[in-house]
């Protein structure tokens, strides 16, 4: 390995819940270090990785690809549409095959919650598993890039007031973030349609209408309305959702001077956020995308350090 500062070693990367606060902070600081000194990365041997995405993705998929290229990894192409999955091959057998072929890392996005548990429990699968999102379960790499973005802005988490707003029930981003942010000392609030709020969130924070939050918070974390995961529960027109729960131009005026706006993207413009605000001064949405590459470099380094 060319660099000396990255010492964190992880067998797999499937959920931030499984990492200690120290390990999470190590990943955050390494991400920022890579961003500030991108020449200080790489390995002195070849590693092989494949990105196996069974759900649509732009940012996660392409930023993992970019991270892999920057690290000098050998990427093996995988397309679910042209693979034996269409012949009925299970995810387990697909990854068993990839492991047998000698892949060091499998980055996977799959619609099944906790799909990775069977894979990491298998004595015959030797590839490191990196979770690129499991249905409406977890999205740990997105959560890490969000943490990096917040830490870059404020330099701490303890005492920060963070509102997570929108499609809470269906959001793997929300689940990953509420858990780790509370653990790191942030004060969490929730808002959005009550139909998409569950009592399971009560242990992490308090639900309040968005108009009671905008002038009180440090971070406004908006969530995409996930139409593809809805079963008809809580149907809103774009206009009504935006006016009731979205970041309108009027609500934007009430944000603190130091507050920032975040969104995991893709953004439904004029639904979760007014289109003109996506690149506003307080918005960090584009920065999140950029930070995704550095966060995923840190993740890949950590799992390859255990090889």
Swiss-Prot record:
<feature type="binding site">
    <location>
        <position position="266"/>
    </location>
    <ligand>
        <name>carbamoyl phosphate</name>
    </ligand>
</feature>
<comment type="subunit">
    <text>Heterododecamer (2C3:3R2) of six catalytic PyrB chains organized as two trimers (C3), and six regulatory PyrI chains organized as three dimers (R2).</text>
</comment>
<dbReference type="InterPro" id="IPR006130">
    <property type="entry name" value="Asp/Orn_carbamoylTrfase"/>
</dbReference>
<comment type="similarity">
    <text>Belongs to the aspartate/ornithine carbamoyltransferase superfamily. ATCase family.</text>
</comment>
<dbReference type="GO" id="GO:0006207">
    <property type="term" value="P:'de novo' pyrimidine nucleobase biosynthetic process"/>
</dbReference>
<feature type="binding site">
    <location>
        <position position="59"/>
    </location>
    <ligand>
        <name>carbamoyl phosphate</name>
    </ligand>
</feature>
<dbReference type="GO" id="GO:0006520">
    <property type="term" value="P:amino acid metabolic process"/>
</dbReference>
<dbReference type="Pfam" id="PF02729">
    <property type="entry name" value="OTCace_N"/>
</dbReference>
<keyword id="KW-0665">Pyrimidine biosynthesis</keyword>
<feature type="binding site">
    <location>
        <position position="265"/>
    </location>
    <ligand>
        <name>carbamoyl phosphate</name>
    </ligand>
</feature>
<dbReference type="InterPro" id="IPR036901">
    <property type="entry name" value="Asp/Orn_carbamoylTrfase_sf"/>
</dbReference>
<feature type="binding site">
    <location>
        <position position="224"/>
    </location>
    <ligand>
        <name>L-aspartate</name>
    </ligand>
</feature>
<protein>
    <recommendedName>
        <fullName>Aspartate carbamoyltransferase catalytic subunit</fullName>
        <ecNumber>2.1.3.2</ecNumber>
    </recommendedName>
</protein>
<dbReference type="GO" id="GO:0044205">
    <property type="term" value="P:'de novo' UMP biosynthetic process"/>
</dbReference>
<dbReference type="GO" id="GO:0005829">
    <property type="term" value="C:cytosol"/>
</dbReference>
<feature type="binding site">
    <location>
        <position position="60"/>
    </location>
    <ligand>
        <name>carbamoyl phosphate</name>
    </ligand>
</feature>
<dbReference type="InterPro" id="IPR002082">
    <property type="entry name" value="Asp_carbamoyltransf"/>
</dbReference>
<feature type="binding site">
    <location>
        <position position="109"/>
    </location>
    <ligand>
        <name>carbamoyl phosphate</name>
    </ligand>
</feature>
<dbReference type="Pfam" id="PF00185">
    <property type="entry name" value="OTCace"/>
</dbReference>
<keyword id="KW-0808">Transferase</keyword>
<feature type="binding site">
    <location>
        <position position="87"/>
    </location>
    <ligand>
        <name>L-aspartate</name>
    </ligand>
</feature>
<feature type="binding site">
    <location>
        <position position="142"/>
    </location>
    <ligand>
        <name>carbamoyl phosphate</name>
    </ligand>
</feature>
<feature type="binding site">
    <location>
        <position position="172"/>
    </location>
    <ligand>
        <name>L-aspartate</name>
    </ligand>
</feature>
<dbReference type="InterPro" id="IPR006132">
    <property type="entry name" value="Asp/Orn_carbamoyltranf_P-bd"/>
</dbReference>
<comment type="pathway">
    <text>Pyrimidine metabolism; UMP biosynthesis via de novo pathway; (S)-dihydroorotate from bicarbonate: step 2/3.</text>
</comment>
<feature type="binding site">
    <location>
        <position position="139"/>
    </location>
    <ligand>
        <name>carbamoyl phosphate</name>
    </ligand>
</feature>
<dbReference type="InterPro" id="IPR006131">
    <property type="entry name" value="Asp_carbamoyltransf_Asp/Orn-bd"/>
</dbReference>
<comment type="function">
    <text>Catalyzes the condensation of carbamoyl phosphate and aspartate to form carbamoyl aspartate and inorganic phosphate, the committed step in the de novo pyrimidine nucleotide biosynthesis pathway.</text>
</comment>
<dbReference type="GO" id="GO:0004070">
    <property type="term" value="F:aspartate carbamoyltransferase activity"/>
</dbReference>
<dbReference type="GO" id="GO:0016597">
    <property type="term" value="F:amino acid binding"/>
</dbReference>
């Amino acid at each position: 390995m060319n660099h000396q500062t990255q010492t964190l070693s992880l067998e797999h990367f499937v959920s931030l819940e499984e990492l200690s606060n120290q390990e999470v902070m190590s990943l955050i600081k390494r991400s920022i270090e890579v961003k500030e000194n991108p020449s200080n990365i790489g390995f002195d041997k070849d590693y092989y990785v494949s990105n196996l995405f069974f759900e649509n993705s732009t940012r996660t998929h392409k930023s993992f690809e970019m991270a892999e290229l920057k690290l000098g990894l050998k990427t093996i192409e995988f397309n679910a549409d042209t693979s034996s999955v269409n012949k009925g091959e299970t995810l387990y057998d697909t990854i068993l095959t990839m492991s047998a072929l000698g892949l060091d890392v499998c980055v996977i996005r799959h619609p099944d919650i906790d799909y990775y548990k069977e894979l990491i429990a298998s004595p015959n699968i030797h590839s490191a598993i990196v979770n690129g999102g499991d249905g409406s379960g977890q999205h740990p790499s997105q959560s890490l890039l969000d943490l990096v973005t917040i830490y870059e802005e404020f330099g701490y988490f303890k005492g920060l007031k963070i509102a997570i707003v929108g499609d809470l029930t269906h959001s793997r981003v929300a689940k990953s973030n509420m858990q780790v942010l509370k653990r790191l000392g942030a004060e969490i609030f929730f808002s959005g349609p009550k139909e998409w709020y569950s009592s399971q969130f009560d242990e992490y924070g308090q639900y309040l209408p968005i108009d009671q939050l905008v002038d009180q918070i440090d971070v406004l974390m908006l969530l995409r309305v996930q139409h593809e995961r809805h079963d008809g529960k809580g149907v809103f027109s774009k206009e009504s959702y935006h006016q009731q729960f979205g970041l309108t131009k009027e609500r934007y005026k009430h944000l603190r001077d130091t507050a920032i706006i975040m969104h995991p993207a893709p953004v439904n413009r004029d639904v979760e956020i007014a289109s003109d605000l996506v690149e506003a001064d307080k918005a960090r949405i584009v920065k999140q995308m950029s930070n995704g590459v550095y966060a995923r470099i840190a993740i890949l380094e950590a799992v390859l350090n255990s090889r």
